[in-house]
């Protein structure tokens, strides 16, 4: 079991489901108890406030799992600012996050694809022992999973990180940021995209060079693998140079 630096916001009450359905980018109403779904909390301009996993814990209670513990308070504050007359409580929780590689470990646990292997994420209300989360970095990077503070921040468009494929429903009702997200989808592409890079060695900040032109920078790296945002015209299997070494692109 590996500890995670996650944040938790509990949203509960008679209007919790309807409120979250109007606030986040993916469908909430169809969630069963114990089921989780990836979503985003966005600004009106379609920028990311917080990547989320929305977990239904009871009929009228949900837990929003944020990428880092530092995102819990901003997430709660953004939701409270939009609550108005909705009958729901919005409370950050000081819980401990964990991921178990392999079998399901807890009564409420949800599967995660963040590490490219079978894994289940859960939380506990009291501290418990677990391995250091840095042990998961090679798996995360090789799987092409973006992390807040590395590949994700409030300047990134969801489509640049590939989150439009996993965190957004284009058929649900309105939510903040829906219009710019839909316009970008109609346009057909973004100018840069997150890619996996097969490279002997790299460091965050290294330039990614293609046809003698800087087309991106490395955001995360471990031995043999890296992530970075690269101009969209570079082919998914293109050969680039990173830190003086030849490297090959892969889609994230």
Residue ranges and their predicted role:
Residues 1-49, 58-59:
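Acidic, proline/glycine-enriched N-terminal capping motif
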Residues 1-3, 7-10, 53-147, 210:
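Acidic, low-complexity central loop/insert segments
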Residues 15-20, 71-76, 105-106, 125-129, ...:
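Short, conserved charged micro-motifs
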Residues 21-29, 77-85, 186, 210-213:
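Short, intrinsically disordered, mixed-charge
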Residues 37-45, 101-107, 201-213:
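Short amphipathic alpha-helix segments
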Residues 48, 52, 156, 161-168, ...:
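Glycine-rich, small/acidic residue-mixed loop/short-helix segments
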Residues 120-193:
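Anionic-ligand-binding alpha/beta catalytic cores of soluble enzymes and soluble regulatory domains
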